[in-house]
Amino acid sequence: MLVARNLTKEYQSGTQKLAVLKDVSFAIPQGTFVAIVGPSGSGKTTLLGLLAGLDVPSRGTVEIDGVDLHDLSEDARALLRGQKVGFVFQSFQLIPTLTAIENVQVPLELRGEPGAAARAGELLARVGLGDRLDHFPTQLSGGEQQRVAIARAFSNRPRILFADEPTGNLDGTTGTRIVELLTALNREEGATVVLVTHDIGIAERTQRIIRLADGVVVEDKLTGTTA
């Protein structure tokens, strides 16, 4: 369960405080696929950073599986992210000098997990890249690079996957395929997926839409889509 309670995030602008998020609250049950939508500047990415423990709120709390992130040190939050959280970004963030399988394998090895190569190969096969294991990022299309990034994000079997505009650099067809892949992994792995997107068509493919405007939740609805 991911719970946000009265989240507020303020930044100092000269002599004034600028509130980017204002008293945001919701709960996301485990295994749900949720989209956070809203116009540019609505606070989507700021909210994602708070939910993931990458930033701390000015007021309010975030809980992951009953653990209040506010009660944790920075090192403890980093440890929790490594154990329970996966990330996918718009810019892929692959290491260009590593092959597809190495990009997935290296984080596993750094965590000391046995069978890292086998797990990496299995994940890449599941995202449809079993024949691209030894390709470098520059030899892959944008959609293929994002699939490598998704495989890497699921390598630690996360309880929650945060995806920040994962289709933003892709054409419509490829973006749809990426969301279909996230849906399949959400169902198969049981991970909660929190997707930030500006594309309402993409959002409608998830189970629930939380809409922000000017840092406030203005809509929270189920889409009728099942995982």
What label would you give each PLM region?
Residues 216-227:
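Conserved beta-strand-loop-alpha-helix hinge in the C-terminal portion
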Residues 1-212, 217:
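ABC family nucleotide-binding domain
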